[in-house]
Regions:
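Sec-dependent signal peptide recognition
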Residues: 2-10, 17
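Generic hydrophobic-segment detector
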Residues: 10-11, 35
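N-terminal short leaders/motifs
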Residues: 11-13, 63
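Flexible loop/hinge segments at secondary-structure junctions
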Residues: 20-136
């Protein structure tokens, strides 16, 4: 029985990886295109504006698959390292982490309604007319 459960779990992991698309960083219509290094600086609070546009990033909830993928693919960090970075930064008065939203729909709504809004979603959630800032 345990062997069957392990096999089913392994198949589920493979299927999940196959279904997961690329991560896209989306921005409000006034947000310019960014490279990965600029996205890293935005999500670590080192850039608060890009090309004269004040940036207001949001993040997925801690522990979600999309956040873990974003941290790995874009930030080259895991959750523990990223959270630790922001704990220190907040302690020394150098900023606060991006607000966390609970669903892709919330991220999309925030980005579309907030000048300078930036967030990340799975490519499968992308809709026509969205401003894709970068993808990976």
């Amino acid at each position: 029985m345990k062997k069957k459960v392990k096999i089913l779990f392994a198949i589920a992991l493979i299927f999940t990886d196959v279904q997961a698309g690329d991560i896209v960083v989306i921005g409000n219509s006034n947000v310019p295109k960014m490279d990965v290094q600029t996205v890293q600086k935005v999500y670590t609070g080192r850039f608060v504006s890009v090309d004269g546009v004040s940036i207001s990033p949001v993040s997925a909830k801690s522990g979600t698959l999309i956040r873990n993928r974003f941290l790995q693919d874009f930030m080259n960090q895991d959750e523990e390292k990223y959270t630790g970075y922001w704990t220190v930064r907040r302690y020394v008065g150098k900023g606060t982490p991006p607000n966390e939203l609970g669903s892709p729909e919330e991220v999309i709504n925030y980005v579309q309604s907030t000048p300078g809004g930036v967030g990340y979603i799975d490519e499968a959630e992308l809709k026509a007319g969205m401003n894709v800032v970068t993808r990976k």
